[in-house]
Amino acid sequence: MTELKADVRNGIDYKVADLSLADFGRKEIRLAEHEMPGLMALRREYHDVQPLKGARISGSLHMTVQTAVLIETLVSLGAEVRWASCNIFSTQDHAAAAVVVGPNGTPEEPKGVSVFAWKGETLEEYWWAAEQMLTWDGEPANMILDDGGDATMMVLRGAQYEKAGVVPPAEDDDPAEWKVFLGVLRERFEQDKTKWTKIAESVKGVTEETTTGVLRLYQFAAAGELAFPAINVNDSVTKSKFDNKYGTRHSLIDGINRGTDVLIGGKKVLICGYGDVGKGCAESLAGQGARVSVTEIDPINALQALMDGFDVRTVEEAIGEADIVITATGNKDIITLDHMKAMKNQAILGNIGHFDNEIDMAALERSGAKKINIKPQVDQWIFDDGKSIIVLSEGRLLNLGNATGHPSFVMSNSFSNQVIAQIELWTKNDEYDNEVYRLAKHLDEKVARIHVEALGGTLTKLSKDQAEYIGVDVEGPYKPEHYRY
């Protein structure tokens, strides 16, 4: 691989596809700002206070137009920011360029934020970009904003290996990405044996966006390896019940349509997983007229699927009949090579969980099947018997690889939670131990209230007597922490 080097212009280091795309990106950012009332309200509320002044935020999250609005909100509240994408295919190159240039800069004289992201990165490029995002001139990063946990893992594993005095060798059967990750840490260790330890000691907290990253945080905490407090943004109601369900409901069919242009109506579809994301998948495809079946390990979710009108089957029972198969579990090895070989000729296979190991892409690549690239992020894999399947985005997030991800309004909910969580950990750090927390209910309700008003809804107001009768304050919060929405 050619050695990667950041570009530097007007004192800003960056690596994006093409800075000349910035004008297009800025136009889309302005449109997105109108559709992101939560972030814009937070800018108005906190701009004069500058609650993030002094924060050096390293962000690892899909570099989209919507994320650009998040980044510029953090900056407007006083933070310094460096950014990389958390997925090799999810970057929107015009958005990345616009963030580097900034609202008041030009491609010749950028005045924005350091971004290291472009669509179609290799694994080596991805982890190089992640390291650049975490590497600051002078003082190290002191906050992390994460999606999937890669930035957090890089800091914590790097510090762990520095303490041990060695980066372990990769095993032959390790995933390709893990081998690359260890290689990057090993190369850095040879040059600087304290880099990650210094960052881990400097970081005051991390806010995590998605289910997969939250699972990693809880695993680090259980092992006593979490070196700083964490806020689980994913399980805020205004994130998980909106982004995960309604966002997916919009973006899944967008990705399938852009990737394949097949008619969804009448097709047999198998959705693996019926959590919030799976529910959004099933609802959107059923709304297009597809005949949907669901796989589940959890009897409660399975019962929900049945009551919603979907068959519940195993992968083995349904795989041979499905025209479209979508994984949405957050687990690994959901679709194996044997499953892929059992699929119908030219069936479509895609994933909308965070990582690419829900579908065993490594086994497919080793199988001897012939890969034919149809167009970016659409590949036909032909098996020895002549049968083929269509795989979207190489088993990674198809809604971001084949389309542009969730729409701005629903991301305004999620990203408002991220901003509030960053402010919470930065300004009240002494109140948090090295554990995983959730945002307080009244903050969740605050985010919801902003978006209700933006959609023209009018909330009913409790009287004092009514509030006392059900044991809540007139201004909320209105539900206990254990309430399930």
UniProtKB/Swiss-Prot annotation:
GO cellular component, one term: cytosol
UniProt main location, coarse: cytoplasm
UniProt catalytic activity: S-adenosyl-L-homocysteine + H2O = L-homocysteine + adenosine
Enzyme Commission number(s): 3.13.2.1
Keywords: Cytoplasm, Hydrolase, Isopeptide bond, NAD, One-carbon metabolism, Ubl conjugation
SUPFAM superfamilies: Formate/glycerate dehydrogenase catalytic domain-like (SSF52283), NAD(P)-binding Rossmann-fold domains (SSF51735)
Positions contributing to NAD(+) binding: 210-212, 244, 273-278, 296, 331, 352-354, 399
Cofactor(s) the protein needs: NAD(+)
Pathway per the UniProt entry: Amino-acid biosynthesis; L-homocysteine biosynthesis; L-homocysteine from S-adenosyl-L-homocysteine: step 1/1
Gene3D superfamilies for this protein: Adenosylhomocysteinase-like, NAD(P)-binding Rossmann-like Domain
HAMAP family recorded: AdoHcyase
Protein name: Adenosylhomocysteinase
Lineage of the species this protein comes from: Bacteria, Bacillati, Actinomycetota, Actinomycetes, Mycobacteriales
